[in-house]
């Protein structure tokens, strides 16, 4: 995604006649590459991003190395420099829009419930959902200020809710009820998430992953299996399955594998206070595909708005102290782990979806008015324009100090997320996180 970002800067600069001296994948010493014209295309030693170097940037002017030629970056009119600065984020945002748009045009398997209105199939006894008055068969017609919410919207809103009441409008066999629901807080990987113990109507539990050495693997459960009954009772939900597993006794499962129906027996494994069977569930899926470009573009737009909304809520909770920045922000190691996890759960489709999410976040982040980032360049251009109205200009000393502040901030942020990633790896090595245990139930 960083390469796409830098390519945006590069190609727009080339189109506008600005000399590009270096296009680098990575930072630090040059490992290898090639030269075409005035540009050195290189791979560098530290694979944590990349950069584009234009002729006649700030430091060259300060060091007296600028020749003042017409193809230097700072010799360009403000509108050209603005287009070059904004091109990187725009390329990222466009990429983020194109990924889900292309995906739905090609077609992919998606949870069948994501786009459906919330109709409750199971409410866990004793849960906050039951205490609020929700029952099996209820249809949620309003969730906060959202009318006819889908399961996707419901899930996203609940997971970022940290103990606040949510007003609900419920249709129960034609009777309209006004209820309030407060999600319970569950800690996963030492980070809080909102949880509501209810589910859509299920006809089976799909198997997305099977953990090595688990009861599921020992019993012969495989990825793609569909569990239709447990101890002779039809599957009605994941919480029903968990309740039976927590009894700690051998279970008998009816499993659909392709055209076959199998009977599988297994005994849950005890870990701490819990009994685990050792697989990750998958909801029923359907082929999501359209031949309409307009529909596909709308899907791409909605997908990105959803990501922005969730990201905004998480950052708001970080700044308000409700959520830990140390647990919420990931660096290169964390992103690599998320990529592997996305592939394990959804294959290359999951990886591509994650790349779109990262591309969007990278594009939006770079528009923030922080020195060194593209938003900082745009801010400087705005200041230049305002000063120009009264006959003043920015001094090179101010530019240098502005860039130095930004450079320090970016280094501190990079160090922070890399240390976080390393700390999480060490914690997992010595102490298995609750999130993983929850996943295996």
Stretches with model-predicted labels:
Residues 68-79, 192-218, 226-228, 233-364, ...:
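Functional transmembrane alpha-helices
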Residues 86-118, 155-159, 164-171, 175-211, ...:
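PDZ/PDZ-like peptide-tail recognition elements
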Residues 103-142, 146-149, 192-229, 233-236:
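PDZ/PDZ-like domain segments forming the peptide/carboxylate-binding groove
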């Amino acid at each position: 995604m960083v390469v796409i970002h830098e390519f945006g800067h590069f190609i727009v600069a080339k189109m506008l006649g600005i000399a590009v001296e270096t296009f680098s994948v990575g930072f630090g010493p040059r490992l290898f590459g090639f030269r075409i014209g005035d540009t050195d295309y290189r791979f560098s030693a530290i694979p944590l991003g990349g950069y584009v170097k234009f002729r006649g940037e700030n430091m060259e002017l300060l060091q007296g190395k600028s020749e003042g030629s017409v193809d230097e970056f700072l010799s360009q009119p403000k509108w050209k420099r603005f287009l070059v600065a904004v091109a990187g984020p725009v390329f990222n945002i466009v990429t983020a829009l194109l990924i889900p748009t292309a995906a739905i045009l090609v077609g992919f398997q998606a949870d069948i419930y994501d786009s459906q209105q919330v109709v409750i199939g199971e409410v866990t006894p004793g849960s906050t959902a039951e205490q609020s008055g929700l029952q099996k068969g209820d249809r949620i017609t309003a969730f906060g200020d959202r009318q006819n919410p889908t399961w996707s919207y419901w899930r996203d809103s609940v997971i970022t809710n940290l103990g606040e009441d949510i007003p609900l409008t419920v249709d129960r066999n034609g009777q309209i009820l006004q209820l309030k629901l407060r999600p319970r807080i569950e800690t996963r990987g030492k980070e809080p998430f909102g949880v509501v113990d209810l589910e859509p109507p299920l006809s089976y539990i799909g198997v997305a992953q099977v953990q090595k050495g688990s009861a599921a693997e020992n019993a012969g459960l495989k990825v793609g299996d569909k569990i239709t009954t447990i101890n002779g009772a039809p599957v009605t939900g994941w919480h029903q399955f968990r309740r039976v597993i927590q009894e700690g006794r051998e279970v008998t499962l009816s499993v659909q594998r392709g055209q076959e129906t199998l009977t599988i027996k297994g005994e849950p494994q005890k870990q701490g206070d819990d009994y685990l069977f050792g697989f990750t569930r998958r909801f029923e899926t359907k082929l999501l595909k359209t031949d309409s470009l307009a529909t596909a573009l709308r899907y791409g737009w909605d997908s990105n708005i959803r990501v922005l909304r969730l990201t905004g809520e998480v950052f708001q909770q970080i700044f308000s102290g409700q959520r830990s920045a140390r647990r919420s922000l990931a660096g290169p190691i964390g992103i690599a782990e998320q990529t592997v996890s996305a592939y394990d759960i959804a294959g290359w489709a999951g990886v591509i979806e994650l790349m779109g999410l990262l591309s969007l976040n990278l594009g939006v982040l770079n528009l923030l008015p922080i020195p060194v980032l593209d938003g900082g360049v745009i801010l400087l251009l705005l200041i230049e324009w305002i000063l120009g109205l009264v006959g003043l200009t920015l001094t090179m000393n101010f530019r240098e100090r502005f860039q130095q502040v930004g450079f320090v901030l970016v280094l501190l942020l990079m160090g922070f997320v890399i240390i976080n990633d390393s700390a999480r790896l060490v914690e997992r090595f010595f102490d298995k996180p609750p999130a993983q245990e929850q996943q295996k139930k």
